[in-house]
């Protein structure tokens, strides 16, 4: 009887081991490489879902809400933005390092024409999980770049320095000059 129980115990252990070995052969999760019915390993899921810069399609009107007279092609742009999960509900995924990237976008003004122009967008370079309440405290000491047209500015959260989303070359392409105080493209002074 002991032999029979021992044999059943070892047989079940072997079956469990073989079953686990079969399912743990799943390849690491890579975009497009995932096969149906494969089990993705915990560490692969964890690494891909944790707070990090990830390519995100951002609607241009979300970044430039006042430019309603144009139709943009493409209407959204791929930007690296912070996304993902933090291990605690009291934390959120926030950018700790940002920079501007300039892209060529077709700007169409209905019944007037179109041109390819440069537009500047904010990209996230590094992200961290930080306490939600600390983020509000961290942003407040800087104060706003401008009371009006805040969307025209980007602010470095560490130095509080404000810079323009518009670029000088973008303004010059429209025969205008960049006004660094207002971050708008103005007519040249004579």
Swiss-Prot record:
Signal peptide start and end residues: 1-26
Keyword Signal: yes
Chain positions carrying an annotated carbohydrate: 100
Record-level GO BP terms: angiogenesis; cell migration involved in sprouting angiogenesis; cellular response to hypoxia; endothelial cell chemotaxis; induction of positive chemotaxis; macrophage differentiation; monocyte differentiation; motor neuron migration
GO MF term list: chemoattractant activity; cytokine activity; fibronectin binding; growth factor activity; heparin binding; platelet-derived growth factor receptor binding; receptor ligand activity; vascular endothelial growth factor receptor 1 binding
Keyword Secreted (UniProt): yes
Keywords: Angiogenesis, Developmental protein, Differentiation, Disulfide bond, Glycoprotein, Growth factor, Heparin-binding, Mitogen, Secreted, Signal
InterPro entries tied to this protein: Cystine-knot_cytokine (IPR029034), PD_growth_factor_CS (IPR023581), PDGF/VEGF_dom (IPR000072), PDGF/VEGF_growth_factor (IPR050507), VEGF_C (IPR027928), VEGF_C_sf (IPR036841)
Subcellular location: Secreted
Disulphide-bridged cysteine pairs: 51-93, 82-127, 86-129
PROSITE patterns from the UniProt entry: PDGF_1, PDGF_2
Gene Ontology annotations for the cellular component aspect, listed alphabetically: cell surface; cytoplasm; extracellular space; membrane; secretory granule
Subunit structure: Homodimer; disulfide-linked. Also found as heterodimer with PGF. Interacts with NRP1. Interacts with BSG. Interacts with CD82; this interaction inhibits VEGFA-mediated signaling pathway.
Similarity comment: Belongs to the PDGF/VEGF growth factor family.
Function: Growth factor active in angiogenesis, vasculogenesis and endothelial cell growth. Induces endothelial cell proliferation, promotes cell migration, inhibits apoptosis and induces permeabilization of blood vessels. Binds to the FLT1/VEGFR1 and KDR/VEGFR2 receptors, heparan sulfate and heparin. Binding to NRP1 receptor initiates a signaling pathway needed for motor neuron axon guidance and cell body migration, including for the caudal migration of facial motor neurons from rhombomere 4 to rhombomere 6 during embryonic development. Also binds the DEAR/FBXW7-AS1 receptor.
Protein name: Vascular endothelial growth factor A
Source organism per UniProt: Sus scrofa
Phylogenetic lineage: Eukaryota, Metazoa, Chordata, Craniata, Vertebrata
């Amino acid at each position: 009887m002991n032999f029979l129980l021992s044999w059943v115990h070892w047989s079940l252990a072997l079956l469990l081991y073989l079953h686990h070995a079969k399912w743990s052969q799943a390849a690491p999760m890579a975009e497009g490489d995932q096969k149906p019915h494969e089990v993705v390993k915990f560490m692969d899921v964890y690494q891909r879902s944790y707070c990090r810069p990830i390519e995100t399609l951002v609607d241009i009107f979300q970044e430039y809400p006042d430019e309603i007279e144009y139709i943009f092609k493409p209407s959204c742009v791929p930007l690296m933005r912070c996304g993902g999960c933090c291990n605690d509900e009291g934390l959120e995924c926030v950018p700790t390092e940002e920079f501007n990237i300039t892209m060529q976008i077709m700007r169409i003004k209905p019944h007037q024409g179109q041109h390819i122009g440069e537009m500047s967008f904010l990209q996230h370079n590094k992200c961290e999980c930080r306490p939600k309440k600390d983020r509000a405290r961290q942003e407040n000491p800087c104060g706003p770049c401008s009371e009006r047209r805040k969307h025209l500015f980007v602010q470095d959260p560490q130095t509080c320095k404000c810079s323009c989303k518009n670029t000088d070359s973008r303004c010059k392409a429209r025969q205008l000059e960049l006004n660094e105080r207002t971050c708008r493209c103005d007519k040249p002074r004579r």
